[in-house]
Amino acid sequence: MDEVTVPVTGTPSGQSSELLGHPPDARLLVVNCDDLGMYPAINAAVIESVEEGIASSCSLMVPCPAAPQAMELLSRRPQIPFGIHLTLVREMPDIPWGPLTAKERVASLLDPTGELFPPTPAGRAALLGQARLGEVELEFRAQIDAVADAGLAPTHLDFHCLADGGRDDILDLTVMLAAEYGLAVRVWLEPGRQTMRKRGLPVTDNDFLDSFSLDIEGKAARYAQRLRDLPAGLNEWAVHPSLGDEESQTVDNGWPVRRTDYEFLTSPQAREVLQQEEIVVIDYRTIQQVWSQSMSPR
């Protein structure tokens, strides 16, 4: 694996908003729709949430069955910024997916039955305890290259159900790949964020919001209040919209979370609160520009 030099572009800023050309008191928000490609009702809701709602970017699960449809939708909408939701786990029993790499080449990523681990605490621990970094790299490259082969240009890399990849060496690998491909990385946990800030790279300044952490009852009001309380600096929400239709309810126990996300993201209320609070919604294309300018392979 090639080493990567990540030079500091100057004295690291106290706020990522400054690295992105905004004053330190600006309230910036990335609203990123995760899980694009998992199944068609997610694809439809993500596209609508970006085109008609307040979402600003999305992340594609390349190994999933509806990923080809998602890539076709993205190919017709080059204005939509999207990242690659690097996927090493599978939580949907009724939606089959596995590694893009031949299984015999990534055996350390598989459970005793030859499938991807579930993202349960035990499943994550087993995966992270046995995964060989070289095999993780093979699979990550396969997912990135599949997007490139489709003629698409992603903006960033992030992780499905593994915060910052789950291990320091996996996060380091991902930053190396981002430098090679000219992408940004979503960094969620504070140790990784501190490291990136020291390198002059913009990452979220404040606590990261995963929409699966919110109660469903009263969610719209809770979202609106979070917007009103949004602190200065760069903020990020990882949201998970789906139409919540019959297909969703059949295959996805998390469909109520996804349906309520979709309802808020596309609501007039969401846009009104953003305007009232003078929150600047940005996307990962903006962040990618700073990352790609700041990193160079050695």
Each model region followed by its residue ranges:
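N-terminal pre-catalytic segment of deacetylase/amide-hydrolase enzymes
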Residues: M1-V30
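Active-site beta->alpha N-cap acidic-glycine motif
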Residues: L20-P93
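Acidic (Asp/Glu)-rich catalytic clusters
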Residues: G21, V46-E52, P68-P81, P99-E104, ...
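Structural preference for beta-strand elements that scaffold enzyme active sites
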Residues: L28-V30, A55-S59, Q79-H85, P154-D158, ...
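Active-site beta-loop-alpha junctions enriched in small/polar residues
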Residues: D34-L36, P63, H85-E91, H160-L162, ...
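Active-site gating loops and adjacent loop-to-helix segments of metal-dependent hydrolytic enzymes
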Residues: I95-A126
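Catalytic domains of cell-wall/extracellular-matrix polysaccharide-remodeling enzymes
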Residues: Q130-P202, S213-E217, R228
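C-terminal domain-boundary segment and adjacent tail
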Residues: V185-R186, V251-R298
